[in-house]
């Protein structure tokens, strides 16, 4: 049996192992298309600001082709470094494209104010054609800018500090688009607006240079459809991270935005580890989780072997990303989601609409959190040197904190996944009722009758007398012995009023016919 287990572990390890690169075969190259990237040909701030202005207008032109749009975006993304040409040549290794760099300098003879640097050749007409400069004699009204502030006609400046602020503002809006351009483009607007507000408050961007939504939609769509552009952006992020010492302010801002970009599309894998394994609840000992725990262990090893590109596997369209989907460990993922919605309010808006979602293990995670509230891990306590007395104190404080958090019910709570309606009385589900459930309902019914006959104060005494001692107390209805007697009496009276009102509404709703609504218990039949 020990040999079988060793063979199984070796099999799982080799199954999820990435392919080993061999030096015998050559690299597979695809059919390349040419991308022209304009870069400044001198160190003048005027040249850079004028090039930035022309590229922003070029991107907003709806008639621009895809490769030309990619080249313009790469040109803007590399404008913040001293030598954009060297940066692009150093980090670009794409089998699908061939990048051609065109140096741009100032010109008084062209309509765009720029021309391509050449030796004795007049390139003003070609530069005007590339930048699609509007003819002043044309009857169509030219579009001067793509900013929400219509008073901004151009962004040409002479001051390096002002240029860096304008460039940083535009780059921040472009980089934020990468976070959800591939995984959730339809719901990206809200998160992008939050990032914009954050950087505006931090004075990293200038609010007046907020780009129009149409312009941002064009860039987001291009990022989503062009893998070569995403490869360049990821390579630029990694190159910035490898840079030692202090980095330029724009580079630090890009690293800050990278925290929202990494692990995009890997939420199921990361959250399963966070809520399913790191919480270390005893439910992990179930036999049903044994195989999936082994799968997760292999995936974590594979993630480490992939190196620095692992967090970007979805953005880079790496085929190995399918191994990390929740369909490879559905039971453990469903359990982890149940734990997550109980521990964090931010998990309440997560979409669980998956074919492999298991409601039973989702409720297992919920109940594991509820019943383990206030308990201290003995293993962790021994490692931290926590005494038994300290553990009891922590448990008592944690119980009060948990009750207070649940009673306030702050934020969205998707833990309430089942809803019982008026036509679904408790008698319709007899096989789900145990002895304890019958005793609790009997005690609640007697408490309601006592409230109607004797009033609030005597009803609370009747409720306390009829409540079974072996029945688990509900944290929403039970009071702690250490509470103030007046507070306990008021809480009991308020709860009894609500229960009495609920009983009256159930009696009134039993006479009306409503369509049958299935709850999550029916899913398990």
UniProtKB/Swiss-Prot annotation:
Organism: Measles virus (strain Yamagata-1) (MeV)
Location in or out of the cell: Virion; Host cytoplasm; Host nucleus
Record-level GO cellular component terms: helical viral capsid; host cell cytoplasm; host cell nucleus; ribonucleoprotein complex; viral nucleocapsid
InterPro entries the record matches: Paramyx_ncap
UniProt family annotation: Belongs to the paramyxoviruses nucleocapsid family.
Annotated stretches, region: Ncore: 1-403
UniProt free text on domains: Ncore is globular and carries regions required for N self-assembly and RNA-binding. Ntail is an intrinsically disordered monomeric domain in the C-terminus.
Keyword terms, alphabetized: Capsid protein, Helical capsid protein, Host cytoplasm, Host nucleus, Host-virus interaction, Phosphoprotein, Ribonucleoprotein, RNA-binding, Viral nucleoprotein, Virion
Binding site for RNA: 180, 195, 202, 260, 351
Annotated stretches, region: RNA packaging and organization of the helical nucleocapsid: 1-375
Motif Nuclear localization signal: chain residues: 70-77
Function noted in UniProt: Forms the helical nucleocapsid (NC) in a ratio of 1 N per 6 ribonucleotides, protecting the genome from nucleases. The nucleocapsid (NC) has a helical structure with either 12.35 or 11.64 N per turn, approximately 20 nm in diameter, with a hollow central cavity approximately 5 nm in diameter. The encapsidated genomic RNA serves as template for transcription and replication; encapsidation by N is coupled to RNA synthesis. Forms the encapsidation complex with the phosphoprotein protein P. Before encapsidation, the newly synthesized free N protein, so-called N0, is chaperoned by P.
Record GO terms (molecular function): RNA binding; structural molecule activity
Residues where Phosphothreonine is found: 279
Protein's gene: N
UniProt feature, compositional bias: Basic and acidic residues: 428-452
Complex formation: Homomultimer; forms the nucleocapsid. Binds to viral genomic RNA. N0 interacts (via Ncore) with the phosphoprotein (via N-terminus); this interaction allows P to chaperon N0 to avoid N polymerization and non-specific RNA binding before encapsidation. Interacts (via the Ntail) as N-RNA template with the phosphoprotein (via C-terminus XD); this interaction maintains the P/L complex anchored to the nucleocapsid template during the sequential transcription.
Protein name as catalogued: Nucleoprotein
């Amino acid at each position: 049996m020990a040999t079988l287990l060793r063979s199984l572990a070796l099999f799982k390890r080799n199954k999820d192992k990435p392919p080993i690169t061999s030096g015998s075969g050559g690299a597979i190259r695809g059919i390349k298309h040419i991308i022209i990237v304009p870069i400044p040909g001198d160190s003048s701030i005027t040249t850079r600001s004028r090039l930035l202005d022309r590229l922003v207008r070029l991107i907003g032109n709806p008639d621009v082709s895809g490769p030309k749009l990619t080249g313009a975006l790469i040109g803007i993304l590399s404008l913040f470094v001293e030598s954009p040409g060297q940066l692009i040549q150093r980090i670009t290794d794409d089998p699908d494209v061939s990048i051609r760099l065109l140096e741009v300098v100032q010109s008084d003879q062209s309509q765009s104010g720029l021309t391509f640097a050449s030796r004795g050749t007049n390139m003003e007409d070609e530069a005007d054609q590339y930048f699609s400069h509007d003819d002043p004699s044309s009857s169509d009204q030219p579009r001067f800018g793509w900013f929400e502030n219509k008073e901004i006609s151009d962004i040409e400046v002479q001051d390096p500090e002002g240029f860096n602020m304008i460039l940083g503002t535009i780059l921040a809006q472009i980089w934020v688009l990468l976070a959800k351009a591939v995984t959730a483009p339809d719901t990206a607007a809200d998160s992008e607006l939050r990032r914009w507000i954050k950087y505006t408050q931090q004075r990293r961007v200038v609010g007046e240079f907020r780009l129009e939504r149409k312009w941002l939609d064009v860039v987001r769509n291009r990022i989503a459809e062009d893998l070569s552009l995403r490869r360049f952006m990821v390579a630029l992020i990694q190159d910035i991270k490898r840079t030692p010492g202090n980095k330029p302010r724009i580079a630090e801002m890009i690293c800050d935005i990278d925290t929202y970009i990494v692990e995009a599309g890997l939420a199921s894998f990361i959250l399963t580890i966070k809520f399913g394994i790191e919480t270390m609840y005893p439910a992990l000992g179930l036999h049903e989780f044994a195989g999936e725990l082994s799968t997760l262990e292999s995936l974590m090893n594979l993630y480490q072997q992939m190196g620095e590109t692992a967090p970007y596997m979805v953005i880079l369209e790496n085929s190995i990303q399918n191994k990390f989907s929740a369909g490879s460990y559905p039971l453990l993922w469903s359990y982890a989601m149940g734990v997550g919605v109980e521990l964090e309010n931010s998990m309440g808006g997560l979409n669980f609409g998956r074919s492999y979602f298991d409601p039973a293990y989702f409720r297992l995670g919920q109940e594991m959190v509820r019943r383990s509230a206030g308990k201290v891990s003995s293993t962790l306590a021994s490692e931290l040197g926590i005494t038994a007395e300290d553990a009891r104190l922590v448990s008592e404080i944690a119980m009060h904190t948990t009750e207070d958090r649940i009673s306030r019910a702050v934020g969205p709570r998707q833990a309430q996944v089942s809803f019982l309606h008026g036509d679904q009385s408790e008698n319709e589900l007899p096989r789900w009722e145990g002895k304890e459930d019958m005793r609790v309902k009997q005690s609640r019914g007697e408490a309601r009758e006592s409230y109607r006959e004797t009033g609030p104060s005597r009803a609370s005494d009747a409720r306390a007398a009829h409540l079974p001692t072996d029945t688990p107390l509900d944290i929403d209805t039970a009071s702690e012995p250490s509470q103030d007697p007046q507070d306990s009496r008021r809480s009991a009276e308020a709860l009894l009023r609500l229960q009495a009102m609920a009983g009256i509404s159930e009696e009134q709703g039993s006479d009306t016919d409503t369509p049958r609504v299935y709850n999550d218990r029916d899913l398990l039949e």
